[in-house]
Amino acid sequence: MWITQEITPYLRKEYTIEAKLLDVRSEHNILEIFKSKDFGEIAMLNCQLLFKNFLHIESELLAHMGGCTKKELKEVLIVDGFDLELAHQLFKYDTHIDFVQADEKILDSFISFFPHFHEVKNNKNFTHAKQLLDLDIKKYDLILCLQEPDIHKMDGLKRMLKEDGVFISVAKHPLLEHVSMQNALKNMGGVFSVAMPFVAPLRILSNKGYIYASFKTHPLKDLMTPKIEALTSMRYYNEDIHRAAFALPKNLQEVFKDNIKS
Protein backbone atom coordinates (compact mmCIF):
# COMPACT_ATOMS: atom_id res chain seq x y z
CA MET A 1 0.00 0.00 0.00
CA TRP A 2 1.09 3.54 -0.75
CA ILE A 3 0.12 7.06 0.21
CA THR A 4 1.01 10.10 -1.86
CA GLN A 5 2.16 13.50 -0.63
CA GLU A 6 1.78 16.45 -2.97
CA ILE A 7 4.88 18.62 -2.54
CA THR A 8 3.91 21.07 -5.29
CA PRO A 9 1.34 20.73 -8.11
CA TYR A 10 4.16 19.18 -10.18
CA LEU A 11 5.99 17.10 -7.55
CA ARG A 12 4.73 14.19 -5.47
CA LYS A 13 6.27 11.70 -3.04
CA GLU A 14 5.01 8.22 -2.26
CA TYR A 15 5.41 6.36 1.04
CA THR A 16 4.92 2.66 1.72
CA ILE A 17 2.40 1.93 4.47
CA GLU A 18 1.32 -1.27 6.19
CA ALA A 19 -2.21 -0.44 7.35
CA LYS A 20 -4.71 2.34 7.98
CA LEU A 21 -5.25 2.86 11.71
CA LEU A 22 -7.78 5.70 11.74
CA ASP A 23 -10.13 7.58 9.42
CA VAL A 24 -11.96 10.59 10.88
CA ARG A 25 -13.91 13.19 8.93
CA SER A 26 -15.43 16.45 10.07
CA GLU A 27 -17.12 19.28 8.22
CA HIS A 28 -13.84 20.91 7.18
CA ASN A 29 -11.07 18.34 7.72
CA ILE A 30 -10.12 14.75 6.94
CA LEU A 31 -7.63 12.91 9.15
CA GLU A 32 -6.21 9.51 8.27
CA ILE A 33 -3.50 7.79 10.31
CA PHE A 34 -1.40 4.98 8.83
CA LYS A 35 1.15 2.52 10.17
CA SER A 36 4.55 2.70 8.47
CA LYS A 37 7.61 0.51 8.95
CA ASP A 38 10.10 3.33 8.32
CA PHE A 39 8.35 6.34 9.88
CA GLY A 40 6.22 4.89 12.67
CA GLU A 41 2.75 6.37 12.28
CA ILE A 42 1.95 8.82 9.47
CA ALA A 43 -0.98 11.20 9.78
CA MET A 44 -2.51 12.63 6.62
CA LEU A 45 -4.44 15.79 7.41
CA ASN A 46 -6.08 17.27 4.30
CA CYS A 47 -3.26 15.87 2.12
CA GLN A 48 -0.50 17.22 4.42
CA LEU A 49 1.62 14.57 6.13
CA LEU A 50 2.83 14.42 9.72
CA PHE A 51 5.43 11.83 10.70
CA LYS A 52 5.18 10.72 14.32
CA ASN A 53 8.90 9.91 14.51
CA PHE A 54 9.79 13.45 13.39
CA LEU A 55 7.17 15.62 15.11
CA HIS A 56 9.89 17.09 17.30
CA ILE A 57 11.59 18.86 14.37
CA GLU A 58 8.91 21.45 13.65
CA SER A 59 7.73 21.78 17.25
CA GLU A 60 11.23 22.40 18.62
CA LEU A 61 12.21 24.76 15.80
CA LEU A 62 9.14 27.00 15.93
CA ALA A 63 8.81 27.08 19.71
CA HIS A 64 12.42 27.96 20.41
CA MET A 65 12.83 30.19 17.37
CA GLY A 66 10.42 32.44 19.23
CA GLY A 67 11.36 31.59 22.79
CA CYS A 68 15.10 32.10 22.44
CA THR A 69 14.81 35.53 20.80
CA LYS A 70 12.52 36.98 23.48
CA LYS A 71 13.61 37.89 27.01
CA GLU A 72 10.17 36.97 28.29
CA LEU A 73 7.56 34.65 26.86
CA LYS A 74 4.51 35.14 29.04
CA GLU A 75 1.66 34.96 26.54
CA VAL A 76 1.59 32.78 23.41
CA LEU A 77 -1.13 32.35 20.78
CA ILE A 78 -1.28 29.36 18.40
CA VAL A 79 -3.84 29.49 15.57
CA ASP A 80 -4.86 27.45 12.52
CA GLY A 81 -3.28 24.16 13.49
CA PHE A 82 -3.49 21.00 15.58
CA ASP A 83 0.11 20.55 16.74
CA LEU A 84 -0.03 20.12 20.51
CA GLU A 85 3.66 19.13 20.51
CA LEU A 86 4.40 22.78 19.76
CA ALA A 87 2.62 23.71 22.98
CA HIS A 88 4.60 21.04 24.85
CA GLN A 89 7.86 22.69 23.78
CA LEU A 90 6.61 26.16 24.69
CA PHE A 91 5.87 25.01 28.23
CA LYS A 92 9.64 24.88 28.75
CA TYR A 93 9.17 28.62 29.33
CA ASP A 94 7.06 30.22 32.05
CA THR A 95 4.22 30.89 29.64
CA HIS A 96 0.46 30.71 29.12
CA ILE A 97 -0.76 29.34 25.78
CA ASP A 98 -4.01 30.17 24.01
CA PHE A 99 -4.67 27.50 21.39
CA VAL A 100 -7.40 28.32 18.87
CA GLN A 101 -8.89 25.39 16.96
CA ALA A 102 -12.59 25.02 16.18
CA ASP A 103 -12.47 21.40 15.03
CA GLU A 104 -12.53 19.50 18.33
CA LYS A 105 -13.41 16.22 16.63
CA ILE A 106 -10.17 16.18 14.63
CA LEU A 107 -8.07 17.59 17.47
CA ASP A 108 -9.24 14.87 19.86
CA SER A 109 -8.54 12.23 17.21
CA PHE A 110 -4.82 12.98 17.58
CA ILE A 111 -4.96 11.57 21.13
CA SER A 112 -2.65 8.61 20.38
CA PHE A 113 -0.55 10.41 17.75
CA PHE A 114 0.79 13.33 19.80
CA PRO A 115 3.02 11.90 22.58
CA HIS A 116 2.19 14.73 25.01
CA PHE A 117 -1.51 15.10 24.18
CA HIS A 118 -2.84 14.65 27.73
CA GLU A 119 0.03 16.51 29.36
CA VAL A 120 -0.66 19.61 27.25
CA LYS A 121 -4.47 19.50 27.42
CA ASN A 122 -4.39 19.15 31.21
CA ASN A 123 -1.84 21.90 31.80
CA LYS A 124 -3.34 24.73 33.86
CA ASN A 125 -1.60 27.25 31.58
CA PHE A 126 -3.24 25.87 28.41
CA THR A 127 -6.48 27.39 27.11
CA HIS A 128 -8.26 25.81 24.15
CA ALA A 129 -10.71 28.13 22.39
CA LYS A 130 -12.83 27.49 19.32
CA GLN A 131 -12.32 31.01 17.98
CA LEU A 132 -10.34 34.13 18.75
CA LEU A 133 -13.44 35.94 19.97
CA ASP A 134 -13.71 33.45 22.83
CA LEU A 135 -10.41 34.66 24.32
CA ASP A 136 -9.82 37.52 26.72
CA ILE A 137 -8.46 40.65 25.04
CA LYS A 138 -4.70 40.72 25.53
CA LYS A 139 -1.36 41.25 23.80
CA TYR A 140 0.95 38.35 22.98
CA ASP A 141 4.72 37.88 23.10
CA LEU A 142 4.57 35.23 20.38
CA ILE A 143 1.94 34.34 17.78
CA LEU A 144 2.29 31.17 15.72
CA CYS A 145 0.09 30.79 12.65
CA LEU A 146 0.26 27.20 11.38
CA GLN A 147 -1.29 27.98 8.00
CA GLU A 148 -0.23 30.72 5.62
CA PRO A 149 -2.35 33.75 6.61
CA ASP A 150 -4.05 36.04 4.14
CA ILE A 151 -3.60 39.80 4.46
CA HIS A 152 -6.79 40.25 6.49
CA LYS A 153 -5.86 37.60 9.05
CA MET A 154 -2.32 38.95 9.27
CA ASP A 155 -3.67 42.44 9.92
CA GLY A 156 -5.88 41.15 12.71
CA LEU A 157 -3.17 39.07 14.36
CA LYS A 158 -0.52 41.79 14.24
CA ARG A 159 -2.80 43.98 16.36
CA MET A 160 -2.62 41.30 19.05
CA LEU A 161 1.19 41.42 19.28
CA LYS A 162 3.14 43.26 21.93
CA GLU A 163 5.47 45.98 20.67
CA ASP A 164 8.44 43.59 20.69
CA GLY A 165 6.33 40.52 19.91
CA VAL A 166 7.25 37.84 17.36
CA PHE A 167 4.97 36.52 14.62
CA ILE A 168 5.89 33.19 13.00
CA SER A 169 3.84 31.78 10.16
CA VAL A 170 3.93 28.82 7.83
CA ALA A 171 4.67 29.62 4.18
CA LYS A 172 5.68 27.77 1.04
CA HIS A 173 9.17 26.28 0.84
CA PRO A 174 11.52 28.89 -0.68
CA LEU A 175 13.31 26.36 -2.88
CA LEU A 176 10.20 24.61 -4.16
CA GLU A 177 7.83 27.57 -4.57
CA HIS A 178 9.92 30.73 -4.45
CA VAL A 179 7.25 32.92 -6.07
CA SER A 180 4.75 32.07 -3.33
CA MET A 181 7.38 32.75 -0.67
CA GLN A 182 8.25 36.02 -2.38
CA ASN A 183 4.61 37.12 -2.27
CA ALA A 184 4.29 36.12 1.38
CA LEU A 185 7.40 38.14 2.24
CA LYS A 186 5.97 41.16 0.41
CA ASN A 187 2.80 40.91 2.50
CA MET A 188 4.73 40.50 5.74
CA GLY A 189 7.14 43.27 4.85
CA GLY A 190 4.24 45.63 4.32
CA VAL A 191 3.28 45.16 7.97
CA PHE A 192 6.44 44.36 9.94
CA SER A 193 9.90 45.93 10.28
CA VAL A 194 11.51 42.47 10.24
CA ALA A 195 10.38 39.74 7.81
CA MET A 196 12.77 36.85 7.13
CA PRO A 197 12.23 33.41 5.56
CA PHE A 198 13.54 30.25 7.15
CA VAL A 199 13.32 26.47 6.84
CA ALA A 200 14.05 23.45 9.02
CA PRO A 201 17.64 22.41 8.17
CA LEU A 202 18.11 18.70 7.35
CA ARG A 203 14.35 18.09 7.30
CA ILE A 204 13.83 16.07 4.14
CA LEU A 205 10.17 15.13 4.53
CA SER A 206 8.55 18.56 4.34
CA ASN A 207 7.41 21.10 1.78
CA LYS A 208 7.09 23.87 4.37
CA GLY A 209 8.86 27.16 4.73
CA TYR A 210 8.31 29.74 7.45
CA ILE A 211 8.53 33.48 8.02
CA TYR A 212 9.79 35.19 11.17
CA ALA A 213 8.34 38.69 11.53
CA SER A 214 8.38 41.39 14.18
CA PHE A 215 8.23 45.12 14.75
CA LYS A 216 11.39 45.16 16.88
CA THR A 217 12.83 41.68 17.52
CA HIS A 218 15.42 40.14 15.16
CA PRO A 219 15.83 36.34 14.91
CA LEU A 220 19.65 36.48 14.76
CA LYS A 221 20.70 39.74 16.39
CA ASP A 222 18.46 39.10 19.40
CA LEU A 223 19.24 35.39 19.76
CA MET A 224 20.09 34.56 23.40
CA THR A 225 22.60 31.71 23.56
CA PRO A 226 22.19 31.16 27.34
CA LYS A 227 18.49 30.42 26.80
CA ILE A 228 19.36 27.81 24.16
CA GLU A 229 21.94 26.20 26.45
CA ALA A 230 19.38 26.03 29.26
CA LEU A 231 16.93 23.97 27.19
CA THR A 232 16.66 20.30 28.14
CA SER A 233 15.69 17.14 26.23
CA MET A 234 16.29 18.65 22.79
CA ARG A 235 16.55 16.19 19.89
CA TYR A 236 16.82 18.72 17.05
CA TYR A 237 17.10 22.38 18.04
CA ASN A 238 20.39 24.06 18.94
CA GLU A 239 22.14 27.32 18.11
CA ASP A 240 23.64 25.97 14.87
CA ILE A 241 20.21 24.84 13.65
CA HIS A 242 18.71 28.21 14.58
CA ARG A 243 21.27 30.18 12.59
CA ALA A 244 21.36 27.74 9.67
CA ALA A 245 17.58 27.98 9.30
CA PHE A 246 17.97 31.48 7.83
CA ALA A 247 20.78 30.65 5.40
CA LEU A 248 19.83 31.03 1.73
CA PRO A 249 21.66 29.90 -1.41
CA LYS A 250 23.01 32.66 -3.63
CA ASN A 251 20.22 32.49 -6.20
CA LEU A 252 17.48 32.86 -3.57
CA GLN A 253 19.32 35.72 -1.90
CA GLU A 254 19.02 37.48 -5.24
CA VAL A 255 15.35 36.54 -5.67
CA PHE A 256 14.33 37.72 -2.19
CA LYS A 257 16.69 40.68 -1.81
CA ASP A 258 13.93 43.28 -2.25
CA ASN A 259 11.46 41.42 -0.02
CA ILE A 260 13.46 40.39 3.05
CA LYS A 261 13.41 42.99 5.81
CA SER A 262 16.18 42.56 8.35
From Swiss-Prot:
Q: In which pathway does it act?
A: Amine and polyamine biosynthesis; spermidine biosynthesis; spermidine from putrescine: step 1/1
Instruction: Please name the taxonomic classification of the source.
Output: Bacteria, Pseudomonadati, Campylobacterota, Epsilonproteobacteria, Campylobacterales
Give the catalytic activity: S-adenosyl 3-(methylsulfanyl)propylamine + putrescine = S-methyl-5'-thioadenosine + spermidine + H(+)
Where is it located? Cytoplasm
Organism in which the protein naturally occurs: Helicobacter pylori (strain HPAG1)
What EC number(s) does this enzyme carry? 2.5.1.16
Per the UniProt entry, the signal peptide is: none
Where are the active-site residues found?
155 (proton acceptor)
What cellular component terms from Gene Ontology apply here?
cytosol
Q: Which GO terms describe its biological process?
A: spermidine biosynthetic process
Name used for this protein in its record: Polyamine aminopropyltransferase
**Cross-referenced InterPro entries:** PABS, SAM-dependent_MTases_sf, Spermi_synthase, Spermidine_synt_N, Spermidine_synt_N_sf
